[in-house]
Design a protein with these regions (language model features):
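Short, structured beta-strand/loop micro-motifs enriched in basic residues and often containing a Trp
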Residues: 3-12
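Short, glycine-/Ser/Thr-/acidic-enriched flexible segments
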Residues: 13, 33, 68-70, 171-173
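Feature captures the catalytic cores and cofactor-binding loops of soluble hydro-lyases/lyases
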Residues: 34-35, 39-162
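Active-site/ligand-binding-proximal alpha/beta "capping" segment
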Residues: 91, 166-186
Length: 186
């Protein structure tokens, strides 16, 4: 029997993310941000230059998604996750400055996992191939930075019960590695 999903609402605190463990089913509601590799590169460059970011990272969640155009009556087009390793070069710097969660698909680098452990952040997986269903969880979307990047612009999303699973927790655990162990032949 599966337990009820855990409900969270950003901004998240250290205490919020410390409660989460790999395999937890989570429903996220409230405000999150979108960003992919081109936007991450720009955020990283701003940090290197000592400049302010276009939004406050503290306690926030970034969803690695590039939406398709929204259909009439929808706030957002398809909202399927992007492969996360493309953000790995930039993520440790963002985590160090207060980012508490990332949503994507696929494994993360050791450097990202170490940053999550050190600065208390988590990585969630959203279901790949379910972009149309995930889009229904987006109630409002607005571009807040880098409009010139088109689908890769940073958007502020208002979401309601976006379903995700904890893949990496603050203790350094990795659901992909632990899951594989169950089925490995010794």
């Amino acid at each position: 029997m599966m337990s009820e999903p855990i409900r969270i609402k950003p901004p998240l605190t250290d205490r919020d993310v410390e409660k989460l463990k790999i395999g937890d089913r989570v429903l996220i509601s409230g405000i999150i941000y979108t960003g992919r590799d081109a936007a991450h590169r720009r955020l990283f460059d701003l940090l290197k230059e000592g400049k302010d970011l276009p939004f406050d990272l503290k306690g926030q969640i970034i969803y690695y998604v590039g939406p398709t155009p929204a259909k009439p009556g929808q706030a957002f087009g398809s909202a399927g996750p992007t492969t996360s390793y493309r953000m790995d070069a930039y993520s440790p710097s963002l985590i160090e400055r207060g980012l508490k969660g990332m949503i994507g698909k696929g494994m993360r680098s050791d450097a990202v996992k170490e940053a999550m452990k050190k600065y208390k952040a988590v990585y969630f997986a959203a279901t790949g191939g379910a972009g149309a269903l995930l889009a229904k969880r987006v109630k409002k979307a607005e571009i807040v930075a880098y409009e010139d990047l088109g689908p890769e612009a940073i958007r502020r999303l208002e979401i309601d019960d976006l379903p995700v699973i904890v893949v990496n927790d603050v203790r350094g655990n990795d659901l992909y590695i632990e899951g594989e162990k169950k089925y490995r032949k010794e």
